[in-house]
Design a protein with these regions (language model features):
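A short, sequence-level motif marking secondary-structure junctions
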Residues: 185-186, 244, 329
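Surface-exposed ligand/attachment interfaces on beta-rich extracellular proteins
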Residues: 255
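A structural detector for beta-sheet-dominated domains
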Residues: 212, 224, 240-242, 342
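Hydrophobic alpha-helical segments, chiefly the membrane-spanning helices
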Residues: 340-346
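Conserved small/polar residues in nucleotide/adenosyl-binding loops
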Residues: 328-335
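Non-transmembrane functional regions of envelope-associated proteins
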Residues: 2-224, 259-324
Protein backbone atom coordinates (compact mmCIF):
# COMPACT_ATOMS: atom_id res chain seq x y z
CA UNK A 1 0.00 0.00 0.00
CA UNK A 2 2.88 2.37 0.69
CA UNK A 3 4.28 1.74 -2.78
CA UNK A 4 0.83 2.48 -4.19
CA UNK A 5 0.86 5.72 -2.21
CA UNK A 6 4.21 6.66 -3.73
CA UNK A 7 2.92 5.94 -7.23
CA UNK A 8 -0.24 7.94 -6.63
CA UNK A 9 1.69 10.90 -5.26
CA UNK A 10 4.14 10.78 -8.16
CA UNK A 11 1.39 10.61 -10.78
CA UNK A 12 -0.55 13.48 -9.22
CA UNK A 13 2.65 15.55 -9.10
CA UNK A 14 3.30 14.96 -12.81
CA UNK A 15 -0.28 15.93 -13.68
CA UNK A 16 -0.03 19.12 -11.61
CA UNK A 17 3.27 20.13 -13.22
CA UNK A 18 1.87 19.44 -16.70
CA UNK A 19 -1.24 21.52 -15.98
CA UNK A 20 1.01 24.24 -14.59
CA UNK A 21 2.80 24.27 -17.95
CA UNK A 22 -0.48 24.12 -19.86
CA UNK A 23 -1.71 27.30 -18.19
CA UNK A 24 1.35 29.06 -19.67
CA UNK A 25 1.81 31.29 -16.62
CA UNK A 26 4.53 33.82 -15.87
CA UNK A 27 7.08 31.25 -14.67
CA UNK A 28 6.65 29.00 -17.71
CA UNK A 29 6.66 31.90 -20.17
CA UNK A 30 9.76 33.43 -18.56
CA UNK A 31 11.61 30.11 -18.71
CA UNK A 32 10.67 29.71 -22.36
CA UNK A 33 11.83 33.24 -23.21
CA UNK A 34 15.12 32.85 -21.34
CA UNK A 35 15.89 29.67 -23.26
CA UNK A 36 15.15 31.62 -26.44
CA UNK A 37 17.64 34.28 -25.28
CA UNK A 38 20.37 31.68 -24.85
CA UNK A 39 19.90 30.59 -28.44
CA UNK A 40 20.06 34.22 -29.60
CA UNK A 41 23.24 34.89 -27.66
CA UNK A 42 24.99 31.99 -29.39
CA UNK A 43 23.77 33.01 -32.84
CA UNK A 44 26.55 33.84 -35.30
CA UNK A 45 26.75 37.54 -36.21
CA UNK A 46 25.84 38.48 -39.78
CA UNK A 47 26.86 41.82 -41.30
CA UNK A 48 24.19 43.60 -43.32
CA UNK A 49 24.85 44.52 -46.93
CA UNK A 50 21.43 46.20 -47.23
CA UNK A 51 21.23 48.70 -44.37
CA UNK A 52 23.54 51.40 -43.04
CA UNK A 53 23.23 53.58 -39.95
CA UNK A 54 23.99 57.29 -39.69
CA UNK A 55 24.22 58.25 -36.03
CA UNK A 56 23.43 61.47 -34.25
CA UNK A 57 26.27 61.00 -31.80
CA UNK A 58 28.57 63.19 -29.72
CA UNK A 59 30.70 64.07 -32.76
CA UNK A 60 27.58 65.19 -34.62
CA UNK A 61 26.50 67.33 -31.66
CA UNK A 62 29.91 68.98 -31.61
CA UNK A 63 29.52 69.84 -35.29
CA UNK A 64 25.85 70.87 -35.46
CA UNK A 65 25.05 71.92 -31.89
CA UNK A 66 22.65 70.65 -29.25
CA UNK A 67 19.74 68.38 -30.06
CA UNK A 68 17.09 68.86 -31.36
CA UNK A 69 18.68 70.54 -34.33
CA UNK A 70 17.00 73.07 -36.53
CA UNK A 71 15.23 70.97 -39.13
CA UNK A 72 17.20 72.61 -41.90
CA UNK A 73 20.21 70.69 -40.54
CA UNK A 74 18.36 67.39 -40.98
CA UNK A 75 17.35 68.54 -44.45
CA UNK A 76 21.00 69.13 -45.30
CA UNK A 77 21.93 65.62 -44.12
CA UNK A 78 19.14 64.12 -46.24
CA UNK A 79 20.37 65.95 -49.33
CA UNK A 80 23.94 64.84 -48.65
CA UNK A 81 22.76 61.23 -48.36
CA UNK A 82 20.81 61.54 -51.59
CA UNK A 83 23.90 63.01 -53.25
CA UNK A 84 25.79 59.92 -52.02
CA UNK A 85 23.27 57.77 -53.92
CA UNK A 86 21.85 55.90 -50.93
CA UNK A 87 18.53 54.07 -51.14
CA UNK A 88 15.53 54.71 -48.89
CA UNK A 89 16.24 57.15 -46.05
CA UNK A 90 14.53 56.28 -42.76
CA UNK A 91 14.07 58.84 -39.98
CA UNK A 92 12.74 57.00 -36.90
CA UNK A 93 12.10 60.39 -35.33
CA UNK A 94 8.83 62.06 -34.31
CA UNK A 95 8.04 65.39 -35.98
CA UNK A 96 4.79 65.91 -34.10
CA UNK A 97 5.29 69.64 -33.49
CA UNK A 98 6.35 72.54 -35.66
CA UNK A 99 9.98 73.61 -35.51
CA UNK A 100 10.37 76.64 -33.27
CA UNK A 101 13.47 77.54 -35.31
CA UNK A 102 11.51 77.75 -38.59
CA UNK A 103 13.23 74.91 -40.42
CA UNK A 104 10.09 73.02 -41.41
CA UNK A 105 9.90 74.19 -45.02
CA UNK A 106 13.47 73.12 -45.73
CA UNK A 107 12.87 69.67 -44.22
CA UNK A 108 9.58 69.40 -46.12
CA UNK A 109 11.43 70.07 -49.36
CA UNK A 110 13.94 67.35 -48.46
CA UNK A 111 11.41 64.63 -47.59
CA UNK A 112 8.76 65.26 -50.24
CA UNK A 113 8.83 62.55 -52.94
CA UNK A 114 12.45 61.82 -52.07
CA UNK A 115 12.36 58.23 -50.81
CA UNK A 116 12.11 59.25 -47.15
CA UNK A 117 10.19 57.36 -44.44
CA UNK A 118 9.45 59.10 -41.12
CA UNK A 119 8.06 57.89 -37.80
CA UNK A 120 4.89 57.99 -35.73
CA UNK A 121 4.06 56.53 -32.33
CA UNK A 122 1.07 54.80 -30.81
CA UNK A 123 -0.25 56.80 -27.86
CA UNK A 124 -2.40 56.21 -24.77
CA UNK A 125 -4.19 59.49 -25.45
CA UNK A 126 -6.96 59.75 -28.02
CA UNK A 127 -5.17 61.95 -30.54
CA UNK A 128 -5.66 60.71 -34.09
CA UNK A 129 -3.30 62.69 -36.27
CA UNK A 130 -1.44 59.59 -37.40
CA UNK A 131 -1.11 58.46 -40.99
CA UNK A 132 -2.79 55.09 -41.70
CA UNK A 133 -2.07 53.17 -44.87
CA UNK A 134 -4.42 51.39 -47.24
CA UNK A 135 -4.46 47.62 -46.83
CA UNK A 136 -6.01 44.75 -48.76
CA UNK A 137 -7.55 42.31 -46.26
CA UNK A 138 -8.48 38.66 -46.54
CA UNK A 139 -10.86 38.24 -43.58
CA UNK A 140 -10.88 40.71 -40.70
CA UNK A 141 -7.51 41.21 -38.96
CA UNK A 142 -8.66 43.92 -36.54
CA UNK A 143 -9.51 41.70 -33.51
CA UNK A 144 -5.97 40.32 -33.46
CA UNK A 145 -3.93 43.53 -33.74
CA UNK A 146 -2.42 45.52 -30.88
CA UNK A 147 -4.56 48.60 -30.35
CA UNK A 148 -3.67 52.11 -29.17
CA UNK A 149 -5.95 54.91 -28.06
CA UNK A 150 -4.34 57.31 -30.51
CA UNK A 151 -1.43 57.82 -32.87
CA UNK A 152 1.08 60.62 -32.43
CA UNK A 153 1.87 61.40 -36.04
CA UNK A 154 3.97 64.01 -37.83
CA UNK A 155 2.78 67.51 -38.56
CA UNK A 156 0.23 67.36 -41.42
CA UNK A 157 2.60 68.75 -44.05
CA UNK A 158 5.17 66.05 -43.35
CA UNK A 159 2.59 63.28 -43.14
CA UNK A 160 1.06 64.22 -46.48
CA UNK A 161 4.34 64.56 -48.38
CA UNK A 162 6.72 61.93 -46.97
CA UNK A 163 6.74 58.78 -49.08
CA UNK A 164 6.17 56.67 -45.97
CA UNK A 165 5.12 57.06 -42.32
CA UNK A 166 5.65 54.04 -40.07
CA UNK A 167 5.01 53.12 -36.44
CA UNK A 168 8.01 52.99 -34.10
CA UNK A 169 6.44 51.27 -31.07
CA UNK A 170 7.82 48.08 -29.63
CA UNK A 171 5.80 45.70 -27.43
CA UNK A 172 8.17 44.17 -24.85
CA UNK A 173 7.55 40.73 -23.38
CA UNK A 174 6.44 40.15 -19.79
CA UNK A 175 10.02 40.64 -18.54
CA UNK A 176 10.53 43.92 -20.41
CA UNK A 177 12.78 42.48 -23.14
CA UNK A 178 12.04 43.24 -26.80
CA UNK A 179 11.97 39.93 -28.67
CA UNK A 180 9.06 40.46 -31.05
CA UNK A 181 7.89 43.45 -33.06
CA UNK A 182 4.36 44.01 -34.39
CA UNK A 183 4.31 44.81 -38.11
CA UNK A 184 0.76 46.15 -37.87
CA UNK A 185 -1.18 48.05 -35.19
CA UNK A 186 -4.62 49.58 -35.07
CA UNK A 187 -6.63 52.51 -33.82
CA UNK A 188 -10.31 51.73 -34.19
CA UNK A 189 -10.79 50.53 -37.76
CA UNK A 190 -7.57 52.12 -39.05
CA UNK A 191 -4.46 49.95 -39.51
CA UNK A 192 -0.95 51.36 -39.20
CA UNK A 193 2.17 49.60 -40.51
CA UNK A 194 5.52 49.48 -38.75
CA UNK A 195 8.33 51.59 -40.14
CA UNK A 196 9.96 48.42 -41.53
CA UNK A 197 6.86 47.57 -43.59
CA UNK A 198 6.59 51.18 -44.79
CA UNK A 199 10.24 51.13 -45.85
CA UNK A 200 9.70 48.00 -47.95
CA UNK A 201 6.48 49.41 -49.43
CA UNK A 202 8.25 52.62 -50.46
CA UNK A 203 11.22 50.67 -51.84
CA UNK A 204 9.02 48.63 -54.20
CA UNK A 205 6.81 51.60 -55.08
CA UNK A 206 3.51 50.10 -53.94
CA UNK A 207 0.64 52.18 -52.49
CA UNK A 208 -0.49 49.51 -50.00
CA UNK A 209 0.12 46.05 -48.59
CA UNK A 210 -1.85 42.87 -47.94
CA UNK A 211 -2.74 40.95 -44.79
CA UNK A 212 -4.44 37.58 -44.41
CA UNK A 213 -6.09 36.33 -41.23
CA UNK A 214 -8.12 33.32 -40.17
CA UNK A 215 -10.05 32.20 -37.11
CA UNK A 216 -6.81 31.85 -35.13
CA UNK A 217 -5.40 35.29 -35.90
CA UNK A 218 -3.08 36.88 -38.42
CA UNK A 219 -1.65 34.31 -40.79
CA UNK A 220 0.70 36.24 -43.07
CA UNK A 221 1.22 39.56 -44.78
CA UNK A 222 2.83 40.79 -47.94
CA UNK A 223 3.92 43.91 -49.74
CA UNK A 224 3.10 43.36 -53.44
CA UNK A 225 6.24 42.56 -55.35
CA UNK A 226 7.89 41.15 -52.26
CA UNK A 227 7.83 37.64 -50.69
CA UNK A 228 5.25 36.68 -48.07
CA UNK A 229 6.08 37.56 -44.45
CA UNK A 230 5.07 34.96 -41.86
CA UNK A 231 3.92 36.47 -38.55
CA UNK A 232 2.38 35.23 -35.33
CA UNK A 233 -1.35 35.58 -34.67
CA UNK A 234 -0.89 39.22 -33.59
CA UNK A 235 1.12 40.26 -36.68
CA UNK A 236 4.41 40.11 -34.79
CA UNK A 237 7.73 38.72 -35.96
CA UNK A 238 10.44 37.33 -33.71
CA UNK A 239 13.53 39.51 -34.04
CA UNK A 240 16.79 37.77 -34.84
CA UNK A 241 19.31 40.01 -33.12
CA UNK A 242 22.41 38.74 -34.90
CA UNK A 243 22.71 41.69 -37.30
CA UNK A 244 25.50 44.26 -37.49
CA UNK A 245 25.48 47.37 -39.66
CA UNK A 246 27.91 49.82 -41.22
CA UNK A 247 27.71 52.88 -38.98
CA UNK A 248 28.84 56.43 -39.76
CA UNK A 249 28.49 59.61 -37.70
CA UNK A 250 26.22 62.30 -39.14
CA UNK A 251 29.24 64.59 -38.84
CA UNK A 252 31.21 62.52 -41.38
CA UNK A 253 29.52 63.68 -44.57
CA UNK A 254 32.62 62.81 -46.57
CA UNK A 255 31.98 59.12 -45.76
CA UNK A 256 28.33 58.97 -46.81
CA UNK A 257 29.37 57.50 -50.17
CA UNK A 258 30.28 54.30 -48.29
CA UNK A 259 26.53 53.71 -47.85
CA UNK A 260 25.66 54.05 -51.54
CA UNK A 261 22.81 51.77 -52.56
CA UNK A 262 21.85 50.94 -48.97
CA UNK A 263 18.77 51.83 -47.00
CA UNK A 264 19.99 54.35 -44.42
CA UNK A 265 18.51 54.76 -40.95
CA UNK A 266 19.26 57.96 -39.07
CA UNK A 267 19.50 57.04 -35.38
CA UNK A 268 20.14 59.01 -32.21
CA UNK A 269 22.95 57.54 -30.08
CA UNK A 270 24.30 60.50 -28.09
CA UNK A 271 24.27 59.95 -24.32
CA UNK A 272 21.16 61.28 -22.63
CA UNK A 273 19.21 61.77 -25.88
CA UNK A 274 17.92 58.27 -26.49
CA UNK A 275 16.25 55.44 -24.61
CA UNK A 276 18.04 52.13 -24.34
CA UNK A 277 15.85 49.07 -24.81
CA UNK A 278 16.48 45.58 -23.47
CA UNK A 279 17.11 42.83 -26.01
CA UNK A 280 18.22 39.18 -25.71
CA UNK A 281 21.73 40.46 -26.45
CA UNK A 282 21.69 43.30 -23.94
CA UNK A 283 20.96 47.02 -24.26
CA UNK A 284 20.25 48.43 -27.72
CA UNK A 285 19.58 51.89 -29.10
CA UNK A 286 15.89 52.45 -29.76
CA UNK A 287 16.27 52.58 -33.55
CA UNK A 288 17.66 49.04 -33.58
CA UNK A 289 14.30 47.17 -33.58
CA UNK A 290 13.44 49.01 -36.79
CA UNK A 291 16.80 48.13 -38.34
CA UNK A 292 16.77 44.50 -37.19
CA UNK A 293 13.15 43.86 -38.20
CA UNK A 294 13.78 45.35 -41.64
CA UNK A 295 16.89 43.21 -42.13
CA UNK A 296 15.07 40.09 -40.91
CA UNK A 297 12.33 40.66 -43.48
CA UNK A 298 14.81 41.38 -46.27
CA UNK A 299 16.75 38.20 -45.44
CA UNK A 300 13.61 36.11 -45.02
CA UNK A 301 15.06 34.70 -41.78
CA UNK A 302 12.44 35.75 -39.27
CA UNK A 303 12.31 33.26 -36.42
CA UNK A 304 9.16 31.15 -36.32
CA UNK A 305 7.61 29.07 -33.58
CA UNK A 306 5.90 25.96 -35.04
CA UNK A 307 2.22 25.50 -34.29
CA UNK A 308 3.03 22.16 -32.64
CA UNK A 309 5.68 23.61 -30.29
CA UNK A 310 3.34 24.03 -27.32
CA UNK A 311 2.10 20.44 -27.58
CA UNK A 312 5.70 19.23 -27.84
CA UNK A 313 6.58 21.17 -24.67
CA UNK A 314 3.64 19.63 -22.80
CA UNK A 315 4.59 16.14 -23.96
CA UNK A 316 8.19 16.67 -22.91
CA UNK A 317 7.15 18.01 -19.50
CA UNK A 318 4.89 15.01 -18.90
CA UNK A 319 7.43 12.45 -20.19
CA UNK A 320 10.39 13.80 -18.23
CA UNK A 321 8.29 14.22 -15.10
CA UNK A 322 6.94 10.70 -15.42
CA UNK A 323 10.46 9.27 -15.88
CA UNK A 324 11.76 11.10 -12.82
CA UNK A 325 8.82 9.91 -10.74
CA UNK A 326 9.29 6.36 -12.03
CA UNK A 327 12.88 6.37 -10.81
CA UNK A 328 11.84 7.91 -7.49
CA UNK A 329 9.07 5.41 -6.81
CA UNK A 330 11.34 2.50 -7.76
CA UNK A 331 13.85 3.68 -5.16
CA UNK A 332 11.04 4.07 -2.64
CA UNK A 333 9.83 0.54 -3.30
CA UNK A 334 13.35 -0.83 -2.81
CA UNK A 335 13.55 1.00 0.52
CA UNK A 336 10.25 -0.51 1.68
CA UNK A 337 11.31 -4.03 0.65
CA UNK A 338 14.68 -3.89 2.40
CA UNK A 339 15.03 -5.68 5.72
CA UNK A 340 17.20 -4.64 8.65
CA UNK A 341 19.29 -7.63 9.85
CA UNK A 342 21.89 -7.04 12.55
CA UNK A 343 22.23 -3.36 11.73
CA UNK A 344 22.60 -4.12 8.04
CA UNK A 345 20.00 -3.45 5.39
CA UNK A 346 19.65 -6.12 2.72
Amino acid sequence: MKVLTHWTLAFVTVIIVTLFHYNDNYVVETARLKSFDLLQQSDELVHSSDIGIVTIDEKALEKYGQWPWKRSVLAGIIWELRQADVGIIVLPILFSEYDRLDGDQELLNAIADNGVVIGQNGSFTANKNGVPRGVAKINDPLPFLFEWEGMLGPIPEFGANADGVGVLNTVPEIDGVVRRLPLLMRIGDDIYPSIAIETIRVAVGEPSYQVKSNAGGIDKMRVPGYPIIQTDSNARIWLRWNKTFDTISASEINRFHELAGKTVILGVTADGLTNIIASPKGGQYNYMPSAVSLQNILDGDTISRPYWAFLAELSTTFSVGFLICLLYTSDAADEEDSVDLGGRRI
